[in-house]
Every structure is written in C-alpha cells, then in structure tokens.
Amino acid sequence: MHATNMLSYTFKVNFLEIFGMTTYKAPLADIKFLLNDVLEMPSIAKLPGYEDATPDMIDAILNEADRFYSEVLAPTNMPADSQGSKLDGNNVITAPALKGVYKKIVDAGWSGLSGSTDFGGQGLPTLLSVAVDEMSHSANMAFSLCPMLTKGVVTALSLYGTKNQKEVYLDKLISGIWSGTMNLTEPQAGSDLSAIRTKAIPAGDHYLLSGQKIYITWGEHDFTDNIIHLVLARTPNAPEGVKGISLFVVPKFLVDDNGLLKERNDVCCVGIEHKLGIHASPTC
C-alpha cells in the first residue's frame, strides 16, 4: 500500500512537471493551408471592404499572432489555473498571472481585428479573426473566453441593437475597453430557456430586471471599467414559451448617451463556480 501511494504521488508530480511546462506554438503551416487553399481567403479578400486583407497582410498578422500568444498569453495558462479567480464581496479578483495581459491584448489591437470600421474596428475578414482566436484559445482557453463572449455581444448589438445602443456600446466593446457577457441560464432553466423566470418591468424609458442567472462566463472581473451583460427576461403579459423572451442590455455601470459611466447598476456576482481546467475564468 505504501509503495502504491508513492507511485501515485510520483506520477502526479511528473504529470505536472511535464504538462505544466509545455509551451504553445501555433501550427502556422496548417492554419495558412486551411485559410488559403481550403477556405479560399484570397477570394474573400477580393470582396468589397476587404481590400486591405492582402496575402502579405494576412501572413504578417498570423505570424505576429503566433508570436504574441505564445510569448504573452501561453505562459499564464498553468499559473492562472492554479491561482484561480476569487470573490471579494460582489467583486471578482482575477488570477495574478493574468494581470496586465488583457491590456496588452487591447493595446495590440487584437480585440478589434474583424470589428466594423464604423466603430473603430479594423474591418478584416471574420475568417482571419477566427484563426487568431484559435491561437488565443489554444494558449489559454480560460482567459480567451472573456473576449469570445464580448464578440458575441458585439454581434448581437450589431444585428439587433438600436442606433443609440450601437453608438454607446459598440466602439468600446470592439476595442476591448469594455467586455460583454451572455446571461441565459437560470437554476431551473438550462437547455430549456422557455422556463426562465427573470422579469423585466417597464419603468419610464428603461426596464427594471429581477431574477437570478447562473453559469455566466466572465460575469464579473477587474479587467475592464464596465461589463455589458445581455440578459434574457420576460416582460409582463409576455406569451409563454420562447416567444415570450426578450433580450436586454444590462451594464455593470449605467452609461449616459455619450458613453460616460454613471452609478453602478444593481447587477452583481454572488458566487464563482469551480470548473475543471478553467479556474482562471470566473463563472458567476
């Protein structure tokens, strides 16, 4: 029995030594082959609005993305997972290993790669952005879930937001100055969203929401000054089922029409889930 315990302990140590010290290197040859020869990036680059996406430009971006994510983000993967995120009152303190990484990504312009040029983005093909996101997720998936959710909010607002919502939120979301989340799941409503109970009551020119959401990826953190939540809720007298669900913009801090922050909203995080392999990602 003693020998078995020792062998088990030795295996665990060796496992951490081997896999904890692995480095990430993007399979650039494979990525470029898929983009150019399978998915026909050169043809996409000829479409209106993508004139800047020349082969040389695409190649340079992919090479720099490989360097950036392998040198800046990948080394944070193991320590950030060990450290995890911590809840302090209603505020989340992110893993120390990630301090400064988010700002480096924003400053380097990776957040707005395929964002609309009307709102400060670079307007490059989404296909290129997907390839770069693959590198980011491979380097540190827990961290990369944050910008991934933000892109989802950008897409939703771009397609369905009002003119005012686009003007107030999109430039800061595309640049990464603010982040975003999707709030769907509730304790009694997982895959069956028709069962959600969160209410949205009209109050003048806005709504007052009440309810509980769970499993919200990066629902609270200290990377950005504001977090823009997209929340599913029901208005009074809404029909039953999925047809009675509406989507609301709920910022962590209220925002005026000029995009300036006002007082903190009532939305808050009351707990953090512990998810295997992504402890650095605060799931609220």
Question: Which residues does each PLM region occupy?
Answer:
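Flexible, glycine/threonine-enriched loop-and-boundary segments that flank and lead into catalytic domains
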Residues: 88-103, 110-115, 181-203, 212-221
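A short core secondary-structure module
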Residues: 206, 210-264
